[in-house]
Amino acid sequence: MPRKGPVAKRDVLPDPLYNSKLVTRLINKMMIDGKKGKAQTILYKSFDIIKERTGNDAMEVFEQALKNIMPVLEVKARRVGGANYQVPVEVRPERRTTLGLRWLVNYARLRGEKTMEERLANEILDAANNTGAAVKKREDTHKMAEANKAFAHYRW
């Protein structure tokens, strides 16, 4: 923990094409080795694929997908009297978004399609339709929290 007080939250600039901070955060999550231009190109091509397939605005589809991925509850390990309990806690809004974006990118990378553009587009489309690996991850997280509901009184 810093001695000089809380660290200031850095604000991201909205991306030039969609003027959205959410898109910028997704680009930053996708970026590998500081290659932001490459990540940007991949995302924009994915959005083009989504627009082509659905006929809807890619941004709306992406926002719906993210809404379907973001978890409401998660479990945190809490040590009580020599035993570790998985305590269900509510996820803060900022962390919800971060987890949603992280899961979206991670599960898109694990898909079998040939290019990253296709993988990301398909994962976003699946998530928008409430299917896909990222949505399954959210469901598993919620199931875990539900299963450990008995330890909710250990919340801090």
UniProtKB/Swiss-Prot annotation:
Keyword field: Ribonucleoprotein, Ribosomal protein, RNA-binding, rRNA-binding, tRNA-binding
PROSITE patterns: RIBOSOMAL_S7
SUPFAM superfamilies on file: Ribosomal protein S7 (SSF47973)
Keyword Transport: no
GO biological process: translation
Role summary: One of the primary rRNA binding proteins, it binds directly to 16S rRNA where it nucleates assembly of the head domain of the 30S subunit. Is located at the subunit interface close to the decoding center, probably blocks exit of the E-site tRNA.
The family this protein is said to belong to: Belongs to the universal ribosomal protein uS7 family.
Quaternary structure (record): Part of the 30S ribosomal subunit. Contacts proteins S9 and S11.
HAMAP family with a match to the protein in the record: Ribosomal_uS7_B
Name of the molecule in the record: Small ribosomal subunit protein uS7
Species of the source: Bacillus licheniformis (strain ATCC 14580 / DSM 13 / JCM 2505 / CCUG 7422 / NBRC 12200 / NCIMB 9375 / NCTC 10341 / NRRL NRS-1264 / Gibson 46)
Lineage, highest ranks first: Bacteria, Bacillati, Bacillota, Bacilli, Bacillales
The gene coding this protein: rpsG
